[in-house]
Amino acid sequence: MDRGMHFTRDLTATRSGLLALLFLTSLTILSNPARAQEAARPPDDSDHIIFIIDTSGSMFKHAWPMVLKKVEETLNLYPQVQGFQVMNDEGVYMFVDDRGKWMPDTPEQRHTVIERLRTWNLFSNSSPIEGIVEAIRTYHDTDSKISLYVFGDEFTGPSIDPVVKSVDAINRDAATGGRRVRINALGFPIRSDAPQYTSTQFATLMRTLCQHNGGTFVSLDERDAR
């Protein structure tokens, strides 16, 4: 399917303005000026955001400049939130003393996060379930509108279905039946000469989780790094 047609279909299927945030990349590679204007829309109405970033070797060695770019672009599209947080896919916090807290949204804090991210190379099993569960269990709040942004390139877990069922259960508010947080994801390309199975698994998993939890999955390719 044509990339532009696929993006348009996703745009009409999601809440107005969400794809303006998720993630500028799918807009910047399109030359259509009308599409570019979508990037100027306000993002969704979340007042707190959490980045869950795969810090595995494949990401750090192959995709890290793109990761830095996309984190900055996402932050820039939120002029002001009440707080944000960063952890890796295993639920390890960028700043361990901040577990259970929100980092204040200030220019200085944003700069600190980006600078720390440049060298943030932790061991990772390339499975976002731990980070997603940690984020939901620790931060869900009925008075807050929270969006998760999962960045990754592979899913190495044995099966997708148990992960989807676990997240569906954890992310459901018992009182209202609604979702506690919105889950969005960005899939990064792996080397063309590497096995593609785990990358396909990540895309399948995150597309399903995003569909179930009010968000959007966007898959990048090498052109998006430019």
Regions found by a protein language model. Name each.
Residues T119-W120, E154-H212, V218-L220:
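VWA/integrin I-like adhesion module and closely mimicked acidic/polar interface patches used
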Residues P42-K101, P104-K145, S147-F151, G157-P158, G187-T200, ...:
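Von Willebrand factor
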Residues H62, M66-E73, E108, T112-R116, ...:
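Extracytoplasmic/secreted proteins, especially bacterial periplasmic and envelope-associated proteins
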Residues R3-L21:
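Bacterial N-terminal signal peptides that target proteins for export
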Residues R15-L22, I29-I50, S56-A63, P104-D105:
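Acidic, polar low-complexity linker/tail segments
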Residues G57, E72-G83, R118-L122, I136-S144, ...:
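Sec-exported extracytoplasmic/periplasmic mature domains
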Residues Q37-P43, G178, D224-R226:
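Pro/Ala/Gly-rich low-complexity, hydrophilic intrinsically disordered segments
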